[in-house]
Amino acid sequence: MSNNDFLVLKNVTKAFGKAVVIDNLDLSIKRGTMVTLLGPSGCGKTTVLRLVAGLESPTSGQIFIDGEDVTKSSIQNRDICIVFQSYALFPHMSIGDNVGYGLKMQGVSKEERAKRVKEALELVDLAGFEDRYVDQISGGQQQRVALARALVLKPKVLLFDEPLSNLDANLRRSMREKIRELQQRLGITSLYVTHDQTEAFAVSDEVIVMHKGKIMQKAPAKELYLRPNSLFLANFMGESSIFQGTLQQDQVTVNGYQFKLNNAAQFGLTDGACLVGIRPEAISFKETGEAAQRCSIKSAVYMGNHWEIVANWGGQDLLVNTNPEQFNPELKEAYVHLAEHGVFLLKPE
């Protein structure tokens, strides 16, 4: 545990009966950063959040906040706040009373509460909403009230449990921008849970991908996407086409087509058989090329800002996303050209 590790889970296991849902997990979050737990349903991400909050107790292992062992501490003694998916607002209270409820429970004076509630509502762009009620504001505004209620307490750690799931696409975008802006401005150490990759990438300093109670990879979003460390990660983090290939120094061969991959060393593989992952945006079609680059177009769907294409290359499907101006939907055959930035290598599995 380094001096800058603010939230730490050490060898944490959680079992419900014989079912192990968190398996000897080690996790550390630096002070003032936002880390997202991302994974499919049932991977254990929400259980980790509940363990950090004190809503569940680990079967074994320890949890530290700011150097203090809080494994056996109640949620009230952890200096943590949670922003829930359901907002969890009191409909019979005004917005001001909802935001100030935690302060009231802490015995903060009425005058100080009013001041801090005003400041919190200004932070989430709801200045002057103190006297309104829950049924008088929109879903997006309700989520901002829930965020203000957490921020007003100035917690050591802020937890987000899929907070944007109930919002439509446009509101999700604006709310994730607001959450990220406030987290960076206030420097609150934060743990965020979602199953939405776009959301995770937008709000996080680092993303932790979980599967079956284990951490598969922890890295900034760009590294996760461009350098996944397993076939599971490659398939989970966006679309890709996976081919059997070979590596010889910086030369990669797929379907008989050999090309140079200048960044091959970063994948840590030895020469020989490998898996070659190709992101759909890394592929372009040309009218000329080697015989090994030739492919046939199976389908093409216009998606507005790009064409979504499935090509047959060497008897295997190749997924391609290309600019509308750079693709002719009448095309039947073409030659595959690869951009290095969207190619990654994996050990054979």
UniProtKB/Swiss-Prot annotation:
Q: What is its EC number?
A: 7.2.2.7
Cross-referenced Pfam families, in alphabetical order?
Answer: ABC_tran, TOBE_2
Localized where?
Answer: Cell inner membrane
Q: Where is the signal peptide?
A: none
Reaction equation(s) it catalyzes: Fe(3+)(out) + ATP + H2O = Fe(3+)(in) + ADP + phosphate + H(+)
Tell me a Gene Ontology molecular-function term this record carries. Answer: ATP binding
Q: Which family does it belong to?
A: Belongs to the ABC transporter superfamily. Fe(3+) ion importer (TC 3.A.1.10) family.
How would you summarize the oligomeric state and partners of this protein?
Answer: The complex is composed of two ATP-binding proteins (FbpC), two transmembrane proteins (FbpB) and a solute-binding protein (FbpA).
Q: What protein am I looking at?
A: Fe(3+) ions import ATP-binding protein FbpC
